[in-house]
Amino acid sequence: PPHRTIMGVVTRSAEKSYPATIESRIARTYPNWALSVVGEGSRLRMMEHIINAYSEADSRIQPEEISEKERISDRILKGRLGEFVSFLSLECYLAPEAMSSVITRFQECPDLDFLYADEDMVRENGEFLDPFFKPCWSPDLLIGMNYVGRFNVMRKQLLLDIGADWGDIANDGFYHLVLRVAEETNKIGRVPQVLSHCHITDESSDITAGQSELDVTAQMKSLQDALNRRGESADVVRDGAGKIKVHYRVSRNPLVSIIIPTKDRWDMLRQCIKSVESVTRYPSYEI
C-alpha cells in the first residue's frame, strides 16, 4: 500500500487540553504510515513523556522540534515524506478506518490531489456529538469558514508545488494551507464518513471555544492574504458576535434587475415594490 506520512501538529489548544495517547490517533487498519509530531520546543516538551514512550516502542513515531526562528512548513518539507501527507491537529484523533478509507478513495479517484472528511466532537466522558457532514468541494464556502476542518490528506507533490510559504499551521488551524491548496488545484474531494473526532471540554460548546485571540487574528490574516493574492477587493472583518466575515468593496454600481413574478396579485406586488423602494440604499436598480 502507498506510504503515508501523518503530521500531528501541537497547537495551543492541545497544550491546555488532554491529548489522548499517540496510539489512539493511529488507525490500525492501515499499516504503511509514519507519524511526525511537530511543534515548537516549549509546546512539544509539554508532551515529551508521551511522545518519547511511543517513539521508543514504534520507530515510525518521531517528534520534530521546531526552533523559534524556524517555520513548521520549512521543517516538514525538509523531512522524508510519504506519497501522501496528512495533517492532524493533536486535539483530534482518527477513527480506526480513517487511513484505509482515504487511501481507498484516492485509488478510486486517481486524479484527486486533496481529500477531507466529515468529523464530530467528543467530550471528556467519551460522548460523541455534533457531527459535521460537510458538502462536496465548495471554494466559496471555504472563504466563509475553514469547513475542511482539522484532518486532511494530500498528495506529496501538491505540498511540494505549494512550497513552504503557508505560515504557522499551529496558529491558524491549517486555514492558510488549505487556502493555498484551493489556489493550486481544484481536484479536491470529500470522504463522506466521520473519520476524525475533536476533543472539547465539558465547559465548551464547540471546537472553536478554545481559540485564542492570536488564533483568530492568524486566521483573519490568512484569509486576507488569500483575497489579496486572488486580486479580490475585499476586507476581512469581525462582526458584533466576533465571527469572521468578508466585506467585498463595490467599485461601481452595475444595474440590478429585480423580477417580481406576481403581477396578477396587486396586494402582494404593492407590498413588494414598497419594501424595495423604502429599504434599499442601492441606487442602480430596475423593477
Regions found by a protein language model. Give the residues of each.
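Conserved nucleotide-sugar donor-binding catalytic segment
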Residues: 139-224
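Conserved donor NDP-sugar-binding/catalytic core segment of glycosyltransferases
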Residues: 93, 97-129, 201
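N-proximal low-complexity "stem/linker" segments adjacent to membrane-targeting elements
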Residues: 1-24, 224-278
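Short beta-strand-to-loop acidic/aromatic patch adjacent to the donor-nucleotide binding site
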Residues: 80-93
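A conserved acidic beta->alpha catalytic loop
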Residues: 39-47
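Short, acidic, metal-binding catalytic loop of nucleotide-sugar glycosyltransferases
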Residues: 23-32, 108, 274-284
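Glycine-rich, basic loop-to-helix element that forms the pyrophosphate-binding segment
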Residues: 66-80
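Short alpha-helix within the catalytic core of nucleotide-sugar-dependent glycosyltransferases
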Residues: 22-23, 82, 95-108, 159, ...
